[in-house]
């Protein structure tokens, strides 16, 4: 068993995006993995939680989770259902507020509710975590991100006016995110 944590990236509903910070970081962080994209039931919360569980089951040793957007909600939902020793930290970057309306092109609150995404769990996470929130994220207000961080027992970091930390917001690479992940290793 290895003692160096493995980084497991947990993408949001867009799954794998070539010019996303998670994709760039995965290439730079040796031995890291990414939860596999779903072939079917892409909006199913349960299917995504099970995909995370399968990815974790394939990793021997400690793990750092690096989640973005709805991936943060997958981590939180997973923690309600499963326990795994050795999760040494979780970066929850730009969590998506699945209880509030999202911009055009994203699922509606009703679609998300029907797919099991609501309500958002508000119990403390059983491992150390950090919510990194943008002051101008169109998918989650800064106030809501701060509220969720408190509920989850997460440290909270204001990363500035960086939108949703995705390609439409100008991210490709996100050096600060990579540094936050490395700090958990």
What do the PLM-derived regions correspond to, one by one?
Residues 167-181:
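Post-His helix in hydrolase/transferase enzymes
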Residues 65-76:
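Gly/Ala-rich beta-loop-alpha elbow adjacent to hydrolase catalytic centers
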